[in-house]
Amino acid sequence: MIQFKNVTKAYDNGIHALQNVNLKVEKGEFLFIVGASGAGKSTVIKLLLKEIEPTQGDVIVDGVNLSHLKRREVPHYRRKLGVVFQDFRLLEDKTIYENVAFAMEITEVPRAEIQRRVPEVLNMVGLGRKADDYPGQLSGGEQQRAALARALVNRPTLLIADEPTGNLDPETADEIMRILVTVNRRGTTVLMATHAKDIVNSMEKRVVTFQNGRIVSDKWKGEYFDEVKNME
């Protein structure tokens, strides 16, 4: 599903955000990527979203080498991805239904399919009764669930979650994780970047640890905090 082959990313200021990274993620896998700020997690996500290009090496997603994508092909590629950020990024002047529907409208999905699929995904994340509310009327946890619904409504093959529990209380964070696990069990590949050691250590998932742009650990379960210090 995802392959990084000898990937290096160096910026103009001389900083090497990634150094010779090799990583393979199988289809249907749930993967945590962890590390201190500046370790390379955000660069991995930006490369997957094709916001930046590698200085060296290949990034391959679902058999497609992203460096070979033409500019006009990038929007079509991104439609196959679901992305959830820490800061929700909901449109404040649209209802929750409209926020989720918008993700389908920009891909020109027929209205009948939108009307069928949006309520379905809102019910899945527990927001069926909040469809007509605006983001400002929702709690932080509800807003994150709305953002998750928006990311899932186009049925992505890969879901990228960048610190999705970062601003949430523990109980709400657990709710978000249960949804992510459910989505993964249905076949979606999930890649989650996080600092939440309690969440990582409570789940029997693969954990890849970055430090100074390199992978320093790749294993199952989240004992990485015993190996890499100062992760916050």
List the predicted regions and their residue ranges.
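Helix-to-loop junction immediately C-terminal to a conserved catalytic motif
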Residues: 49
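Conserved ABC transporter NBD signature motif
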Residues: 57-65, 77
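Short coil-to-helix segment of the ABC ATPase nucleotide-binding domain corresponding to the Q-loop/switch region
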Residues: 94-101
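Conserved ABC ATPase signature
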Residues: 133-138, 142-144
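A short, proline-enriched helix->beta-strand linker immediately N-terminal to the Walker B motif
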Residues: 153-157
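Catalytic Walker B motif of ABC-type/P-loop ATPase nucleotide-binding domains
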Residues: 159-162
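Helix N-cap at the start of a conserved alpha-helix in ABC-type nucleotide-binding domains
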Residues: 170-172
